[in-house]
Amino acid sequence: MIQVLLVTICLAVFPYQVSSKTLKSGSVNEYEVVNPGTVTGLPKGAVKQPEKKHEPMKGNTLQKLPLCTTGPCCRQCKLKPAGTTCWRTSVSSHYCTGRSCECPSYPGNG
């Protein structure tokens, strides 16, 4: 009963499995799936690279994301330059690294 249930689940989840074709070399790892159900053998040791079908990018389609949103080393969604004072005590000062919105050793960092 359990085996029937497992087979049914497998068939429901993986309905379009393609069986591999064993080549003359005896290796099942040397095959190329052209489309489901069709397997084309490659020469021993050959690797076929997939075709690249990329269209050239037209204009700047990427949106700039904010580098930071809050923190003592963040101003208007941009990181403050390295060396900018982010926290000062009577004994010492702490400076932004230019790579993080958090101040090193800032008490609000936890």
Curated annotation (Swiss-Prot):
It is found in: Secreted. GO terms for cellular component: extracellular region. InterPro entries: Disintegrin_dom_sf (IPR036436). Keywords: Cell adhesion impairing toxin, Disulfide bond, Secreted, Signal, Toxin. Expressed by the venom gland. Two conformers are found, they may differ by their disulfide bond connectivities. Conformer 2 is 33 times less active than conformer 1. Conformer 2 may represent a non-native protein. Residues 1-20 form the signal peptide. It comes from the Eukaryota. Disulfide bonds join 68-77, 73-96, 74-101, 86-103. Residues 27-110 form the Disintegrin domain. GO terms for molecular function: toxin activity. Negative results: does not show inhibitory activity toward alpha-IIb/beta-3 (ITGA2B/ITGB3), alpha-V/beta-3 (ITGAV/ITGB3), alpha-2/beta-1 (ITGA2/ITGB1), alpha-5/beta-1 (ITGA5/ITGB1), alpha-4/beta-1 (ITGA4/ITGB1), alpha-6/beta-1 (ITGA6/ITGB1), and alpha-9/beta-1 (ITGA9/ITGB1). Monomer. This is Disintegrin jerdostatin. It comes from Protobothrops jerdonii.
